[in-house]
């Protein structure tokens, strides 16, 4: 859960998915 949220934030900020 926490890892998913962190990945989502990094994805939005870095725009690297």
UniProtKB/Swiss-Prot annotation:
<comment type="similarity">
    <text>Belongs to the frog skin active peptide (FSAP) family. Brevinin subfamily.</text>
</comment>
<keyword id="KW-0044">Antibiotic</keyword>
<keyword id="KW-0878">Amphibian defense peptide</keyword>
<keyword id="KW-0964">Secreted</keyword>
<feature type="disulfide bond">
    <location>
        <begin position="11"/>
        <end position="17"/>
    </location>
</feature>
<protein>
    <recommendedName>
        <fullName>Brevinin-1DYd</fullName>
    </recommendedName>
</protein>
<comment type="function">
    <text>Antimicrobial peptide.</text>
</comment>
<keyword id="KW-1015">Disulfide bond</keyword>
<keyword id="KW-0929">Antimicrobial</keyword>
<dbReference type="GO" id="GO:0005576">
    <property type="term" value="C:extracellular region"/>
</dbReference>
<dbReference type="GO" id="GO:0042742">
    <property type="term" value="P:defense response to bacterium"/>
</dbReference>
